């Protein structure tokens, strides 16, 4: 779909200001260290506001009280979001106990937020606690390097596949890819860990002095599970196994979901198949994809800087040939693979070596002690006795992994006693939202705070039409940046203004089709009216086993998005 209008390999023109900022930052140092000592403001100033993102942080404020503070002639209540680097979402119980303690003692909100990129975030870190949080992470073998801005972000890996041995192999590759693509600058260690500056000059052999044109996301996915939503990502390694052993990967490049309202130069896009590669070429190919995007990505317009736009501009075959040239390989034909679902398997699943995995549903990934449901305390109590690890899933849930048979009852009792195993409907299990208000500065409409009650109402609609045992993959994202992955849902809501959303339908359960906008800028009641009509038709007219999204396409209710660069906005 990308060979119709081949364009220039490099976009000429005035570089965006972000490129100036990166070039002048001295390999991401800026004046962050000096800014830390400025007690006159709770935030970071100038370029540092953006540079801290390379160190895994975003500067935010509490939007619920922004107007009140302005009326009092006070600056916004600045606080940082910090996102940990956690390839594949695997975290030890020792590490969990440390982050639980920090969240309780040193953040405004006291919560841990699991994200759909398989890691955790702290919200509400005051400036005085910014350095301590990095030092706490380092003390337990973690960091926040490259979890935001123009780098390869946290690498995802299927959390709980049918073959646990395959997970172990795939997870090791997720870690290797993450480490290989990390920035080499010593700025992180110097600023946060007080390591001395050495005389040698920084070099970035892979990322370059101005790093990537835009954010870059990578996954390792094990079919038939598409839990990590590969089509939301720039670079995807689809595991191919023979006799239960990993032998290589299919490579898919150029997925991405973020758009800008009304900007028809932006669109969501599924990833393109490049071919199959044996394991020994994995790191060379990963580096080649990244460096090709580094050199060819649009540095004049950040709205058109992601890999998906580079592929559309130069053509898939041209990009693929350059990756082959740089990696010194020829891709083999894509090997067969299929996705049959992407939801987590809530409850107990038996793995290898007589070990068990317990997947706990965490609504919106928000871990906090709620009235009657002390989730945060419950996970801490499990961490105190569990000898295995936790795995954070790309559906914002948590797996208590590698539980011996003789410990199952003990772990389950702790989970039940703390409200971690309450019954959940299939519809709620298959719904997700980004954080949005009150902390996200980009939020246009509620998402996390809106979703629970909205799903109550959706369940009412489904009950009315006799399909309560079914589910519709439902996602809410507070703005068109798309962190809630609404652009791969069967029903996707994209925030437009307070209380108003664009309604997208026509995606599928497996996450391989982009949904199209069905109604624009509508209220919750209007959304529910539309769903009432559509679910009613689905209940009566669907074929055996037909999901809601597939039905809306087959019935002609919505046209499928086939070539996003040309038909996403039609």
UniProtKB/Swiss-Prot annotation:
What keywords sit in the KW lines? 4Fe-4S, Amino-acid biosynthesis, Cysteine biosynthesis, Heme, Iron, Iron-sulfur, Metal-binding, NADP, Oxidoreductase
**Annotated pathway, please?**
Sulfur metabolism; hydrogen sulfide biosynthesis; hydrogen sulfide from sulfite (NADPH route): step 1/1
Which residues of the sequence carry a binding annotation for [4Fe-4S] cluster? 434, 440, 479, 483
Please tell me which top-level EC class this enzyme sits in. oxidoreductase
Q: For this protein, what does the record note about how its cofactor is bound?
A: Binds 1 siroheme per subunit. Binds 1 [4Fe-4S] cluster per subunit.
Recorded catalytic reaction(s): these are: hydrogen sulfide + 3 NADP(+) + 3 H2O = sulfite + 3 NADPH + 4 H(+)
InterPro entries the record matches: CysI (IPR011786), NiRdtase/SiRdtase_haem-b_fer (IPR005117), Nit/Sulf_reduc_fer-like_dom_sf (IPR036136), NO2/SO3_Rdtase_4Fe4S_dom (IPR006067), NO2/SO3_Rdtase_4Fe4S_prot (IPR045169), NO2/SO3_Rdtase_4Fe4S_sf (IPR045854), NO2/SO3_Rdtase_FeS/sirohaem_BS (IPR006066)
Binding of siroheme: at which residues? Answer: 483
Domain of life assignment = Bacteria
Question: Any one Gene Ontology biological process term?
Answer: hydrogen sulfide biosynthetic process
Please give the cofactor(s) recorded in the UniProt entry for this protein.
Answer: siroheme; [4Fe-4S] cluster
Q: What is its EC number?
A: 1.8.1.2
Q: Extract one GO cellular component term from the record.
A: sulfite reductase complex (NADPH)
Annotated GO molecular function terms are: 4 iron, 4 sulfur cluster binding; heme binding; metal ion binding; NADP binding; sulfite reductase (ferredoxin) activity; sulfite reductase (NADPH) activity
Q: Which family does it belong to?
A: Belongs to the nitrite and sulfite reductase 4Fe-4S domain family.
SUBUNIT field: Alpha(8)-beta(8). The alpha component is a flavoprotein, the beta component is a hemoprotein.
Q: What does this protein do?
A: Component of the sulfite reductase complex that catalyzes the 6-electron reduction of sulfite to sulfide. This is one of several activities required for the biosynthesis of L-cysteine from sulfate.
Name it: Sulfite reductase [NADPH] hemoprotein beta-component
Q: Which organism is it from?
A: Klebsiella pneumoniae subsp. pneumoniae (strain ATCC 700721 / MGH 78578)
Identify the coding gene. cysI
